[in-house]
Amino acid sequence: MIRTKKQGLLIVLSGSSGSGKNTVCDLAKKTNKNLWESISMTSRKPREGEEDGKNYYFVTEKKFEENLEKGNLLEYAKFAGNYYGTPKSSVQKMLDSGKDVLLVIEIQGALQIKERFPSALFIFLLPPSMKELKRRLKLRHTESEEELMKRFSIAYKEINELPKYNYVIVNDEIDEAANKLNAIITAEKCRVDRIEEVYLDSEEEKMHETLVDKELENKRVNL
């Protein structure tokens, strides 16, 4: 009998600010009940409508650095002047339970994950165009003009990191992008190197061994 490995799949989703990572992730989780999103820790201030423990764990820069020193983070990055990181314990617990864990993180953190977990699945989310990316960021009204220019500059640099990812999804339509994310996860879990072969039960194994022994004995007699 063939079965998938019990441990869940570690999935990394990256993309520039305004690419729609969080929205796509939320939609994907609605139809994929085995997908669990890790909540990141950040030192940035909450935006309007964001909740602590739901969107992020919002902490001070000092508190973040304390967690970093204690080894409590799976990865971390400093982006646009703020720290972002993934708490370690909850991720491992969910993977061991068989849940597929999705990390929505910046490229710096993703590359750290790739070094430590090369078998993880890496997906990059792109906006349909840089023009559309600028439009989306401006609609948020959360950054100053200077901050927007900084994010545009970072986005251009991030595109050069695409070859380090396994898949790219162009987020032209939210529902379609979420469906593609789940389709990639499903296909990836069907790869030969992600499954294991096991015997149906011990009695079947013994029966097989007995038949092999008899066949070898018959060959020796015929010789």
Give residue ranges: language-model regions:
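Extreme N-terminal, non-catalytic leader segments
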Residues: M1-L10
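NTP-dependent small-molecule kinase module
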Residues: T4, K157-L223
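P-loop (Walker A) phosphate-binding loop of NTP-binding proteins
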Residues: S14-S16
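ATP-binding Walker
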Residues: S19
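Walker A/P-loop
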Residues: N22
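Post-Walker A helix-loop "phosphate-sensing" segment adjacent to the P-loop in P-loop NTPases
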Residues: K29-S38
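ATP-dependent small-molecule kinase phosphotransfer cores
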Residues: S40-V101, Q108-L111
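Conserved phosphate-donor/acceptor-positioning beta-strand/loop module used by diverse small-molecule
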Residues: V101-E106, E115-R140, V170-E173
